[in-house]
UniProtKB/Swiss-Prot annotation:
The keyword Acetylation does not apply. It is found in: Secreted. Residues 29-86, 94-149, 151-206 form the MIR domain. One of its GO terms (cellular component) is extracellular region. InterPro entries: MIR_dom_sf (IPR036300), MIR_motif (IPR016093). This is Stromal cell-derived factor 2-like protein. Residues 1-19 form the signal peptide. The keyword Amino-acid biosynthesis does not apply. PANTHER family: GH21273P (PTHR46809:SF2), STROMAL CELL-DERIVED FACTOR 2-LIKE PROTEIN (PTHR46809).
Length: 212
């Protein structure tokens, strides 16, 4: 009976997977939409925005919250983020994200939100960027303003910046700020006051929903 159930599930899911792939080939999805699960690449380094069940220290101004890093490889599921509406608001899946929208980025594996605050980052001593909340529920420190370089809508592969709504700092990575043990080779993600090359990001791998 269990074998029959498994066969039925495979018969249902496999065609759906291939249907989605063929749909993308016939009708490329060019716009970034709410509900999509994406990887974000730091433009200067090509590192992916990443989180994991490793916490910052609480001494020296750290928060003790789940850490966020830049990861050098593109094949880790801990680099997947789901695009959601701002804290306290729901946005329909498939709605196009526009320049100036306030969004949350929910870490797919741990269900915590990309977050920032006035706690101090461990290496560069700028604003710490962490993951916070439970099952996608956090606070206004999870809100980020989308700033596209051109156009009114966030397009796949386009350079984009994320400005933290509460602190007005920009999500950034600095290649020289590299961690040692227990996460060697990964780089610090922090909130920087200046809009510069280190604050540029773009979408890469992921599951993208067509616009509605």
């Amino acid at each position: 009976m269990k074998s029959l159930f498994l066969i039925l599930i495979l018969c249902i899911t496999i065609p759906l997977i291939f249907a989605n792939e063929s749909q993308y080939e016939d009708h490329p999805i060019t716009k970034v939409t709410y509900g999509s699960m994406v990887k974000l690449a730091h433009v200067p380094t090509n590192f992916r925005l990443h989180s994991h069940k490793v916490s910052y220290g609480s001494s020296g101004g750290g928060s003790g919250q789940q850490s966020v890093t830049g990861f050098p490889e593109n094949d880790d599921t801990n680099s997947l983020w789901v695009i959601k509406g701002p804290h306290g608001n729901r946005v329909l899946q498939g709605t196009v994200v526009k320049n100036g929208d306030i969004i949350r980025l929910v870490h797919s594996n741990t269900k915590k939100n990309l977050h920032s605050h006035l706690a101090v980052s461990p290496l560069t001593k700028q604003n710490e960027v962490s993951c916070f909340g439970e099952n996608g529920e956090g606070d206004t420190g999870d809100n980020w303003i989308v700033e596209t370089e051109s156009g009114k809508e966030w397009m796949r592969g386009q350079v984009v910046r994320f400005k933290h709504a509460d602190t007005k700092t920009y999500l950034q990575a600095i290649e020289s700020a590299k961690y040692q043990n227990p996460i060697p080779g990964q780089i610090e993600i922090s909130g920087g006051k200046s809009k510069n090359e280190d604050t540029k990001w773009r979408t890469e791998e992921g599951i993208y929903f067509d616009e509605k």
